[in-house]
């Protein structure tokens, strides 16, 4: 929060990467949706710059999981970023219960229920990251592995998740 902090400045992504490296940490940067305007860098330039800033700081790809909800971001990294692409994480914004089967084939980044993990894997995607409710189900009062998680593992996908999805005020 800069507005309320007199004299404060935001760090650049490269400065943030240098701090992470200095403290011996691993990184999971998320590339947000970017809409370039006239005179702004292209989307591919931004995708490449993220990787370059980690390599310039001396990061091994083994310590960086690039992530995005945007299918083309992950596809770009897989195709153009060597070992960094092998660890790129496709964030699944699907918020069903992990049992509904189907996929909007016209929009591969918008799965409905259980995505086509075999196709993701064939495209070079190795990591999927859905919200927690996609990985677990209630099986007669007992916690069980969801169909989504079983399908992802069967296709050879690595799974990373987050524990809290918050789309509105916490008071709700």
Regions found by a protein language model. Name each.
Residues 1-75, 79, 83-96, 123, ...:
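Metal-dependent phosphodiesterase/phospholipase catalytic core, i.e.
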Residues 38, 44, 87-172:
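C-terminal active-site rim and adjoining tail of enzyme catalytic domains
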């Amino acid at each position: 929060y800069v507005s309320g902090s007199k004299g404060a400045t935001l760090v650049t992504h490269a400065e943030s990467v240098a701090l992470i490296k200095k403290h011996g940490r691993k990184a999971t940067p998320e590339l947000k949706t970017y809409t370039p305007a006239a005179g702004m860098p292209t989307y591919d330039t931004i995708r490449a710059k993220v990787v370059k800033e980690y390599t310039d700081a001396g990061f091994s790809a083994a310590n960086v999981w690039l992530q995005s909800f945007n299918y083309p971001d992950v596809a770009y990294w897989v195709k153009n970023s060597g070992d960094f692409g092998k660890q790129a994480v496709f964030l699944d914004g699907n918020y069903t219960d992990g049992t509904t089967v189907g996929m909007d084939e016209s929009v591969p980044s918008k799965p409905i229920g259980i995505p086509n993990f075999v196709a993701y894997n064939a495209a070079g995607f190795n990591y999927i990251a859905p919200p927690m409710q996609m990985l677990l189900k209630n099986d007669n009062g007992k916690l069980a592995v969801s169909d989504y998680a079983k399908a992802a593992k069967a296709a050879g996908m690595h799974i990373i998740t987050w524990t809290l999805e918050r789309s509105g005020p916490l008071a709700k």
